[in-house]
From Swiss-Prot:
Gene3D superfamilies: Argininosuccinate synthetase, chain A, domain 2, HUPs
Gene Ontology terms for molecular function: argininosuccinate synthase activity; ATP binding
Lineage: Archaea, Thermoproteota, Thermoprotei, Desulfurococcales, Desulfurococcaceae
Complexes and interactors: Homotetramer.
Residues that hold L-aspartate according to the record: 117, 121-122
Protein name: Argininosuccinate synthase
Keyword Ligase: yes
GO terms of biological process kind: argininosuccinate metabolic process; L-arginine biosynthetic process; urea cycle
Pathway: Amino-acid biosynthesis; L-arginine biosynthesis; L-arginine from L-ornithine and carbamoyl phosphate: step 2/3
Organism annotation: Ignicoccus hospitalis (strain KIN4/I / DSM 18386 / JCM 14125)
Enzyme class, broadest EC rank: ligase
Length: 396
């Protein structure tokens, strides 16, 4: 084995992995860092990669691709795993895997590697991308192989002269444009309230402004295109909402999560923009979709989120679901007015040129009402199956 391409975050695990891979396989190690919006010092990451022993380092700016190829379909699918988590990490991993494979092909590498552990979801997500896109390339998972604990990793890094000052952080953080995940420390106790020091994107709700913020989000075909009437690129909308909603304390998630590998974990997230966009659009869908469309879309949305969380981005059913959900979103056009106030978001208005709601028919103040004869006929036909089966079974 002569060349290994490693998905490199710059943290302890992947930095140790560089030196370990060189030592274990006698191979040249090429590191790849993919910029998906994480607030990192990429120059420092590059320097650390070389100090760890990398022969070459790639920094790939994939923010626009992340937004257009991954976040956009997630918005259309109202993607919230277990109804709360907007899949920031799960969406980024297939893209990172794809970029690692591109570099591996360019460099003529024999193998690719990742820094995921055997307890986490990311091992599945990375390897799904590797296997789908380059089944001929060998996959190496150093952390699953070396058997070192955290303390031993530090000692190994010190021995190899790898600078890991950032690893004194209390929590394990994964961040991109769509969400920020926080793990470790006292958060592993489900009874322990997350301390404020764990959060960066959102202010404590009780310290948010005393005055609410009203915001109008315009959607076209299920995708936000404007804020307060000003058209913006999706990446700009996400950035703006992360700041605005976060300033009002909105966007925190704290829940018990069912991992791909069968373990439960306590997960804490910040996702102000994601939750603002998705919860606004879900309300708009109620205005423009009929009852059957709405019910089917809710089912498909949930399945899409489960699929992506479980590492199956490269499954053909995901492509089919994208097509179905896009078709169902053709009429999801209009404006949603939301009120942000001290950690909460309320939809307070919605309008659409495609609205199915008709005040002239629905209002109790309108002159049109179904006749008694029409109502009786509908009720009898609607209830027949239920009434007959209930009486036959339980009123003998």
């Amino acid at each position: 084995m002569s060349k290994i391409v490693l998905a490199y975050s710059g943290g302890l695990d992947t930095s140790v992995a560089v030196a370990w891979l060189k030592e274990k396989f006698g191979a040249e190690v090429i590191t790849v860092t993919v910029d998906v919006g994480q607030k990192e010092d990429f120059k420092e990451i590059e320097e650390r990669a070389y100090k760890a022993g990398a022969s070459k380092h790639y920094l790939i700016d994939a923010k626009e691709e992340f937004v257009n190829k991954y976040i956009k379909p997630a918005i259309i699918a109202n993607a919230l795993y277990e109804e709360v988590y907007p899949l920031g990490t799960a969406l980024a991993r297939p893209l990172i895997g794809e970029k690692v494979i591109e570099v591996a092909r360019k460099e003529g590498a024999d193998a690719v590697a990742h820094g995921a552990t055997s307890k986490g979801n990311d091992q599945v997500r990375f390897e799904a991308a590797f296997k789908a896109l380059a089944p001929e390339i060998k996959i190496i998972a150093p952390i699953r192989m070396w058997g070192m604990n955290r303390k031993e990793e530090y000692e190994f890094a010190k021995k190899k002269g790898i600078p890991i000052s950032a690893e004194s952080k209390k929590y394990s953080i994964d961040e991109n444009l769509w969400s920020r995940s926080i793990e470790g420390g006292e958060l592993e106790d489900p009874w322990q309230e997350p301390p404020e020091e764990a959060f960066e994107w959102t202010v404590p709700p009780e310290k948010a402004p005393e005055e609410p913020a009203y915001l109008t989000i315009t959607f076209e075909k299920g995708v936000p295109v404007a804020l307060n009437g000003k058209r913006m690129e999706l990446i700009e909308i996400i950035d703006t909402l992360n700041k605005l909603a976060g300033q009002h304390g909105y966007g925190r998630v704290d829940h018990m999560e069912n991992r791909v590998v069968g373990l439960k974990s306590r997960e804490v997230y910040e996702a102000p923009a994601a939750l603002t966009i998705i919860n606004s659009k879900k309300d708009l869908e109620k205005l423009v979709l009929n009852k059957r469309e709405y019910r089917i879309k809710r089912m498909l949305d949930s399945y899409w989120a489960d699929l992506v969380y479980d590492g199956l981005w490269f499954d053909p059913i995901r492509v089919a679901l994208d097509n179905m959900l896009s078709e169902l979103s053709e009429n999801v056009n209009g404006d949603v007015k939301v009120k942000l106030y001290k950690g909460s978001l309320r939809v307070v208005g919605r309008r659409s040129p495609n609205a199915i709601y008709d005040k002239a028919i629905s209002s109790y103040e309108s002159e049109w009402f179904p006749s008694d004869e029409m109502a009786r006929g509908f009720i009898d036909a609607w209830l027949m199956d239920s009434v007959v089966s209930f009486r036959k079974r339980y009123l003998k």
